[in-house]
Structures are given as structure tokens and as C-alpha cells.
């Protein structure tokens, strides 16, 4: 029997209400409530002019752009701090804080020459000039283990000496903390600072490493150099991302881990400065008149107002002209398009081609202690031991890979044209090409990957999994916890559609799985759910940080004993012993393949083929289930996003410089005209 879901059916199935939870934060404003904050809180839209007001419903856990990697939290880094290079609205790289740069292949060194620029505080007052040393101090902060930067791998992988420096201080912290790893590895330090690491494979000593050995140096106030570990082709694209931004060194030294926990502890050198942050109230950025490119900053004040029910209240406030932008969810989209008073207020966000979505299985369902973090794993009600048996079965995972019809879940957010967003790979098309101009998706084994959805094959894998798991002592139905973040528009509805569609396939004739949808917290979702192992199956996303396929391995790769990016803990399950046999082999083969691909630095075609083969093995072994590209949100907005910066990697698309606030909400016809005119 063939099961399918019509557009009408899946919309009817997606009626779950989103209820957010709030947590009080520690972030504060600069000097108390300002007039801008009061105006924003009252909800007055610009009606064309120099202010931009929007709601937000998820509390940032930090504003520290040197340590965060979350979408919301990088707003300060994107808009309040300038980068060495930036992009125009067509995706062409141009000057930023650096006016020119050159590459010395013999020494593997990039040299950047900086323009005059100033740091300003939360009142917009000049603090000090931006110097090359600010880039050096910021990178040292990123490489300090105590600050737990989420982006440290983007430095240790490419900057000469960074890996040795970082590892030494990790081992030193372990020694000072008396850490003993699960395999019995111990860390000790002598009076001279030499760290001894004693493990099952032997003993190694590590002498102290001076930061001078790291390949970042301030030659003078306006000259900065980076020395790389190899001729990395994507380095310039990496500079438009958080760990390579500057920070005022004396402030970092003064406040340490309190950097960017408030407007007062955040200095800016970008298009805007952070003027105010009141936890669960307002978030205000103001135009920075000291910025070298201030003439191209057209929005004077950016106000974000906290509203736990932004997805519901935002559209109503748009109708009253109280805010400048709101997301129009799928539950109201049809009615807005049918209403003469609102149909011309609906357009879309600019497509973000560097974000892709995929489903991850949790390979760490049981508690695990890393050296610097603890993963709690699944709650008992979701039967973690039973889940551990299930995910160890390739047949079980392939039943999901072939049983999921991504078209119906994508159609929740893209009622029309959803086929254009489907992916059978993790990496999106047109991401990069080899020296012959061949798209990366046509390199190596990725060229052989096609559509997976096939109900007959899914049931074959299900039947094989039932036989295999019954012999292993598993019980049915397998409980599958599927969480979502209630602050993400339509995620709940996508979960409902996925449950209905997948269960209709895999439970046809046998009670195979029980997908249990759970609402996670609106605030701290990643830390509470994904990074804590509180899921069985989870929709995850990844945005490329730079233009090289290695970036697409970051969610999955784990070095031995490391917690990695805390997506699925693939290697952790193997190291803990409940992932065995062919699944363990597939995991370790992938890790080895990534390490081998990373080591290829002189032949770009061989490098791309190697990464393509690794990604194909990840997918073909159903260690990940590809879903699709980021679907542009339907919006009511007064911004012409086609004026803004654009790049297929990094955070350029989040920058507001160059964008005007219009005196009307953009219609779809105007959106398309703006797109064509860019």
C-alpha cells in the first residue's frame, strides 16, 4: 500500500500550538533605560525613516561574539564589529577594516593593512583606536580553554601553532583540575609548567607554549599577519566570521569571561554600537557615527523587543503598524494572502544558501562525562537502553533514511516550490567547485547520491531491523523522542507532519516506532536539548563558515575522546561501547576519512574528492538523514534585504548596513523586482 499526504492533509495535521518558556538572564543595559528603549518598548514602527523595530522571543545566553556560534547571538558580532573583509549585495568580497592584503606562499603568511577606525562604548563615545593588536588579543581569547569558545576549531585547524597552544592549556587545565578521563588518562604538571599526560597508549609530556608561537602577529598598529598551517584556499572567506573579529584587548583583560555580557562590557567598531540590553525586555543597537562607512548605514536605531509570543503577536502588531517586521507563519499565510488588506504586505526573506538542514540520531543516549562537559542523555521514559540498541542497527537507521518524504515537511514552510529546497546531501549545491569547475556535489561518491525516499525500501529495512533488533532484545515500538524549539516558527508543525508521514510508512503492518514530540525550552534550547543528548531524532542545521568542504564536516567529526560540535556524538557512542559492529566501523571510517581529507592541502581536486567520499559514506550508512536547504521565511517587512550584504558563508547576511527602511511593507511583486534589480 502506498501512503501519501496531500497539501490539505498536512496543513490540517499541523495545529500544534507553540508555548514558549522564559528564563531570566544576566545581561543588562548601559546606564539604565534610554529614550530609545522606551520608544521601542511602546512598539512604534518607523513608517519609513531611520528606525527599525522587531520582536524576538528567544533569550540569548550570551552576546560574546568570540565564543558563540548560535544564529541569534551572533547579531552583535555581525552588526557591531567590523571584519577585515566584507561582501557587497552581490556576494563580491571587498575591503573592510583592511584596505589591502597580500599572500606570501613561501611563508604561508597573509598580511593585512588596516584603516583608521575607533572603538566606541555603549554611549557611542570613542574609547581607543582599533589596532592590529586587537585581532591578536581576540584570537588569544578564543584560544583560552576557560572561555569555551564554540569556534576554536576554526582557529586551531588553520593558524600555525594554534593547535599546540590550545592543547597545552587544555591539558594544563585538566592537570590543575585533577581530571581523570574515562579510559584512565591522567594529567599532572610540574613546577616548570610541563604537563604529563599518562594514558593507556603511553606517556607524553607537553612543555609550556608561548602565544608568540601562534601565527598571528601585530607588526605595527596597522599591520596584521596570519601564518597558516597550509595553503588553505578558503581563508579569506573565514575572516567574515566570529573568531577572526577584533576585540579591545584592555577590555578583554579587565572583564575576562564577563566580556559582552552587557552593553557596558561590549565595545563596538562596526556599523552599529550596542546601546542597551535589558534582559527579556529590549535590545538596542544605534548607528555608529565613528564608523568609516557610516554614510552607508541608513538605519539609525535597531530595536528588538522581547515578546514570548512573538509568532502570534508580531503579525497583529504589523496590522497596526507598530513594528517593522514579523514572520508570517504557515498557519496564517493563506489567510493573509487571501485578504485584500494584507496580501500586499507579504514577501520573503532573502534566501540563505549556506544553511542546510538534516536529521540526526542521538548516539549518546546514556550519561557521559567529557573533560569539560557532561551529557545527561535521554530521560528514562524514552528508554535509552532500547534506543542504544536501535541506533546500532544500520537497518533501523536506513528505514528512516528511505522512509522520510522531505517534500511534505518542507512544504510546511514553502507551500509552493518546496521541491527546490530538497537535499539528498549535507552540503548544498553551488557551494564550491574544484579546479575544473565541477560542482562539489558531483565530486567523488557524492555524484552517485540521488533521491532516497522509497516506501518499499523503507519497509524492507524496517523488516530487517525488526528481526535484528528482536534478536538483540529490543522492544517495540521503539520510542523516538522528537523535540522542537517553540520559538522557531512552524517547527512544531513540521514535527507533526513528520510523525504522521513516517509512522504511516514504517508502522504499516507492524507497530515499529512511536514518535513522541516534545517541546523544548525557547531559551537555551541547544544547551538543554541537543548538546545534552535529550533527543532521539532531531532536526539540526548547519551554516558553512568558509568556502571549503571541511566546514561541512564540523557537525559530525569528533577527534578521539573529544566532544566535537555536540550534534550527534557519533564517536562517543563507539567509545562508550554500545555502538559496535558495522555501525562502529562506519563511524570510525568516517572519522578517519575526514582526517585523511583534511591532510590533503596541495591538490584541491583530490581534497574535494576525499571530502565528498567521506560525506557520501556518512549519508549512505544513514548516520545522518539529509533534509533540505533553508527555506526563506514569509515576512511582513519594511526592509529591502536585497540591498544588504550577501555571502554563501559566514554571517554577512545578518548585517543591516546598506539597507533602507521603507515607508511601506514590501509586497511579493516588489520583492521580486528588488531581487532582479540588485
Where are these regions (language model features)?
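Ligand/substrate-recognition segments at binding pockets and active sites
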Residues: 122, 279, 305, 451-456, ...
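Gly/Pro-rich hinge or "lid" segments in bacterial periplasmic/extracellular proteins
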Residues: 181-213, 221-222, 227-303, 311, ...
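Long beta-strand-rich cores associated with HINT superfamily self-processing modules
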Residues: 636-678
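Extracytoplasmic/peripheral linker and loop segments enriched in polar/acidic and small residues
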Residues: 10, 389-392, 396-398, 402, ...
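Alpha-helical secondary-structure segments
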Residues: 132-137, 221-227, 271, 300-301, ...
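Extracellular/periplasmic solute-recognition and catalytic clefts
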Residues: 275-286, 303-376, 412-413
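N-terminal lobe/hinge region of extracytoplasmic solute-binding protein
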Residues: 55-105, 267
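Append "and occasionally in soluble cytosolic enzymes with long acidic Gly/Pro-rich linkers
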Residues: 94, 286, 387-506, 613, ...
